[in-house]
Amino acid sequence: MEPGTNSFRVEFPDFSSTILQKLNQQRQQGQLCDVSIVVQGHIFRAHKAVLAASSPYFCDQVLLKNSRRIVLPDVMNPRVFENILLSSYTGRLVMPAPEIVSYLTAASFLQMWHVVDKCTEVLEGNPTVLCQKLNHGSDHQSPSSSSYNGLVESFELGSGGHTDFPKAQELRDGENEEESTKDELSSQLTEHEYLPSNSSTEHDRLSTEMASQDGEEGASDSAEFHYTRPMYSKPSIMAHKRWIHVKPERLEQACEGMDVHATYDEHQVTESINTVQTEHTVQPSGVEEDFHIGEKKVEAEFDEQADESNYDEQVDFYGSSMEEFSGERSDGNLIGHRQEAALAAGYSENIEMVTGIKEEASHLGFSATDKLYPCQCGKSFTHKSQRDRHMSMHLGLRPYGCGVCGKKFKMKHHLVGHMKIHTGIKPYECNICAKRFMWRDSFHRHVTSCTKSYEAAKAEQNTTEAN
C-alpha cells in the first residue's frame, strides 16, 4: 500500500511483451488486421496501431491518409521487410551478415531509426561485413514470386537464418579479428584489379571504416584517410571526383605490419588511367551533354531556384552500386566510365596539389566523422531530417501534393513555387517599368533587357538635348 493513500499499486512486468506476442499471433493468423502492406506483389497483414507506434512513416500513412493498403517501392526486399515487420512485434531482429546494408536501406526508408542505428553499429564494429557483401552480390536480388514464400522464410530463421549470422557474432567476440579486418580492408585498397560495378559504394564505406579504426593517429590523419579510394573503381551513373594519391607509408601504418606488395606512384596512376581510357568507347556528343546536365543537377543539391521543368526529373544517386537501384541504366554506366576516366586523366597531373589541399583542410578541423547519419550511397548527414529527405530522392518519392491540381513534388519548396500558378502571386517587380513577374528567372531576364533599353533611350535623349 502506498503511504498516505488507500490504494494498492501492482505491476505486471511481462504484460507488454505478452500483449505484443498475442498481437503477433493474431497477425500470423490474419485476425483483427486492419492494414495491408504490399511489397513486390507480396501482401503482409498487420495492425495499424503497431505500425504507427514503431515507424513514423507508417504513422503518417495510417493517421494522415487513413490508408488501409500501403504499397512500398519495388526496391524493397520482401524478405527484409518481413523480418523488420516481425521485429516490430517481437523486439528482435536477425540480420544475415551479407544483407545488413539491405536492412539499413529499408529501415531508413521506413524511418525506423532504432534499426538504422543498430545496423550502423554493426557495420562500424564489423567492417568485414561489407567485404562479405562484395562476394554475395546476388543476395540483393529480390526473390521471385515462384520461389519466395512470404509467410514461411522469416519463421525458419532457426534453421536457415542462423547459417550466416554466427559469422558476424564471431567477429564481435574475437579480439584478434580486428587485425584481420584491417588486413582485409587494406588488401581491398591496394588491389590493382577493378572492382565489380555494384561494389563502388561499399568500397567508399570500407575507407570510412578504416579511418574510424585508426582514429588514434589524430584528427588530421583520420580525415585524410577517410577520403582515400582505390586507383580506379567502376563508377556509378554519376562520376566520382575524389581521386587522391594513396601514400605507401599511410597504408603501412594502417595495416600495422601488413606486407604491402603494391607501391602507388605517379607513373602507376597514369598507367592505370591510360588502361581505363583504352577500354571504353567514345560516346556521341549529345549523350555527353545529357550527362553533364545530370551531373550539374546532383551537384546543385536540388537548388531552390531550379526551373519547374526540372522538378519531375529523377536522379539515380545509387547508380549501379546496387541491383535494386540500377534499373535500365546500362547506357548511363558507360557514360560514367568515360567521364571518370577523363576526369582522372586531368587530375593525375595535379595529384600532389590535391593531396596538399586535403591535408590543409584536415588541419583546419574539417572531419567527415562529424556527420553521424550515413546513407548507403556513401553520403553522410548531420541531421536525421536531412537523411530522410535524401532517402526520398533515392526512392523517387513525391510526398508533397498540390490540393488544387493534384500534382506531386519531391521537395516542399517546389510545391510552394508551384502554388504561385494557382494563386497568381507575382512577387518580383521591375524598378524601371513596374512590370511584375511570377518567376525569378523571368524577372532577371526582363531586368537585363529592360535596363539595356532604358540606358539606350537615356543616352539617345542626352544626345538629342546636346544637339
Curated annotation (Swiss-Prot):
PANTHER family (alphabetical): AGAP004733-PA, ZINC FINGER AND BTB DOMAIN-CONTAINING PROTEIN 43
Glycyl lysine isopeptide (Lys-Gly) (interchain with G-Cter in SUMO2) cross-link site: K182, K241, K247, K297, K358, K458
Keyword Transcription applies: yes
Location(s) in or outside the cell: Nucleus
Compositionally biased intervals (Basic and acidic residues): 164-174, 182-194
Species this protein is from: Homo sapiens (Human)
Zinc finger (C2H2-type) boundaries: 373-394, 400-422, 428-450
Source superkingdom: Eukaryota
Protein's recorded name: Zinc finger and BTB domain-containing protein 43
SUPFAM superfamilies (UniProt xref): beta-beta-alpha zinc fingers, POZ domain
Record-linked Pfam families: BTB (PF00651), zf-C2H2 (PF00096)
Main location: nucleus
Annotated gene: ZBTB43
GO cellular component: chromatin; nucleus
Keywords of the record: Acetylation, DNA-binding, Isopeptide bond, Metal-binding, Nucleus, Phosphoprotein, Repeat, Transcription, Transcription regulation, Ubl conjugation, Zinc, Zinc-finger
Stated family: Belongs to the krueppel C2H2-type zinc-finger protein family.
